[in-house]
C-alpha cells in the first residue's frame, strides 16, 4: 500500500481577456515550445473569426463545440488471459473536456487552410453545428465502446 498522498486536483485558471477557463485550457493545449503569447494570439484571432462568421457570442459557440465533442465513454486496452481487450470505461467531465479539446485541435491541425486561427475557428463552428472531424472522432469512440460492451465487466 502506498504511503504517498493523493495529488490535489488542479483547477484551470481563466484567461485575462474573456475570463474563461475553457479558453485557457485551449491555450495551454495549443501551446508549442513555451510560446504562450503566440498561443493566445491564435486563440483570440480564432474567436474573432467565429464572431465574424456566426455573428453570435463566440464563447457560447466554443462552449457548444466542446460540449458536442466531449465523449461520455471511451475504450481502454486491458490484457485479459493473454489477449488484449478493448474495455469500455466511463469518462469524467474534466477528462472528457480535455479529450474534446485535444480532438478539436488535432482536427483543426489536419484541416487545409491559411493559418491555425482560421482552421481552428472553422473546426469550432463545424463542431458547434454537429459536423466536422472532431465530432466524427467522438462518434467513432462511442461506436467502439458500444461494440465492446460485452467486455465492460473487466473494468
UniProtKB/Swiss-Prot annotation:
One of its GO terms (biological process) is translation. GO terms for molecular function: rRNA binding; structural constituent of ribosome. One of its GO terms (cellular component) is small ribosomal subunit. Part of the 30S ribosomal subunit. One of the primary rRNA binding proteins, it binds directly to 16S rRNA where it nucleates assembly of the head domain of the 30S subunit. NCBIfam families: rpsG_bact. This is Small ribosomal subunit protein uS7cz/uS7cy. The lineage of its organism: Eukaryota, Viridiplantae, Streptophyta, Embryophyta, Tracheophyta.
